[in-house]
C-alpha cells in the first residue's frame, strides 16, 4: 500500500469512526481561570460583531423579491434540472449579497485581530456563526441571535496541536493555553480508564492508526483508537465562582462504566419496550414491567424548585419596575423604543440566586433523564415510540377562540411544561442510548394512532385530550398513556402496524401489572402529572 493510499484510508476511517467527549475539571489556579473567562468574553464580543454583519447581509438578501420568489419556486418544483438551475441562481444571489461561508470566514480575521483572539479560536467561532446562518438559509431558522453579557462561549480549537495543544508529562495529560499550562482532575474510574486509553494511544499513535486502517480494509468496521481529536475549554459560573472544564473529544466509543466492585454499572435487557412520551410524563410497557412516571424528576423537590424559579423571576420583575418606572406605560406594558435600565443591588442578588437555581435544576433534569434512559435500556433492547412533536406543541395557538362565557381562550399551550420536563431531550437521549449499546430505536408512522385504537372493538375511536382514564368497548377502565404504550409494545415489524393478535394475548397480563402500578401510586401518594390518577 502506497503512502498516498494509506493517508486516504486513514482519512476515511476518521470520517466513519465514532466520537465521544470526556468532561473533566481543570486544575488551573484562580488567576488563570479569570484569564480564561476574559478570553471567552472577547470571543463573545467578536462573535457578536460578526453576527451583526451577517445579519445585515442576510436581511438585505431576504428583502429582495427575486430571492423570495426563487425560494418559493424551489420549494414547489420537483423536476431535478429545474431544481439545479434554481439552486444555482440562489447561490449566485447569496454570493452577491455576501451571505457565504467564505465571506464569514474572511470577515472574522480582522475582527479577531481587533480583539486579540488566536486565529484558530476566531475561525471556530466563525464556523459556529455560519452554522446558525445555514439554519436560516436552508432550514427553519428565523434569525441568528447575539450572545448576552454574562454568557461565556466555549474556547475551542479544532486541532489538537493548535490553540490548546496537549502533551504528556510524568505519565499525565497536560494542556497549554498561551503561556498557561494546566492539568485535569481525574475523579473516578471511568475518567481514569478514558485517560489511560488516550495515553496508550499517544505512546504509539502510528501503530494504532495502522491497526485501525487494516481492520477497516479486512473487516469493514471501525475499532476504537481513543485518539484525542481536539480540546475545548468551557468556563462556568458555579455558586458565585468561575470554574473551567475541559471537554476532550476522543475517537471511538466511550469506555464502559463499572461500579466499585468491578461489575458493569448498567445492565442491558432483551425484549420489546413500548413507550408513550407526553409533555410531562412517560408511560412504558415491557416484557417484565409497566411504568408511569413524571419526566425529568429526581427526588421530590423538583416542583418546589420550579416554583422558586417563578418566585425569583416575579421578585426581579417587581424590582425592575420600581427602579425603572419611566420605561413602562400606565397599563404596565413596556414602552417601545430605546431605553436605559438601572438595576439595584437587590435586583443583582436576586438575579444571581435565580441563575444558580436554574443551573441546579438543569443539572438535575439532565441526571434524571440519563437515569430514566438507563432504566429503560435495562428492560429491553427494542424501543418503540411515536415521533417527536414537542416543538409543535410548544408554539402558541394561531386561531383566536371564544369560550361559552364569551371570553377569549388563552393561546398558550405546553411551552412551560416542555421547558421544565424536556420530553424531546429525553427522547433524544433514549435514542442515543439504544443505538450506541446495540439496541434498536423505532419511531412509528403518524397513521399508527396509538391513542385512538381500541383492540376490543378493533376500531379507531377519537377521544378528548381531557379523557385521561377511559373505558374500552368491553368496559375495561384503562389509563390513556399506559394503554398507548401497550399498543406501541404490540408493534409488528412486518406490517409496521399494531399486532392485533398480540394485543389480545398479552393484554390480560399487562393490564394486571397496570392495576398494581396504579394501586402502588395511590398507596405512596405519588402525584403523576396529567394522568387522571387522583391521590388523596
Located regions from the model:
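Catalytic micro-motifs at enzyme active sites that drive phosphoryl/nucleotidyl and oxygen chemistry
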Residues: 12, 230-236, 254-264
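Amphipathic alpha-helical surface "interface" segments used
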Residues: 66-76, 145-163, 507-523, 527
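Generic detection of short hydrophobic beta-strand segments and adjacent strand-loop junctions
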Residues: 16-30, 182-197, 293-295
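Short amphipathic alpha-helical coiled-coil/interface segments
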Residues: 43, 90, 126-133, 350, ...
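Acidic carboxylate diad motif detector
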Residues: 77-240, 415-416, 420
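Gly/serine-rich nucleotide phosphate-binding loop at the start of the catalytic core
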Residues: 1-123
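Positively charged, helix-rich recognition surfaces that bind polyanionic ligands
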Residues: 244-536
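Stable alpha-helical structural segments in soluble proteins, enriched in small hydrophobic residues
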Residues: 50, 124-136, 482-492
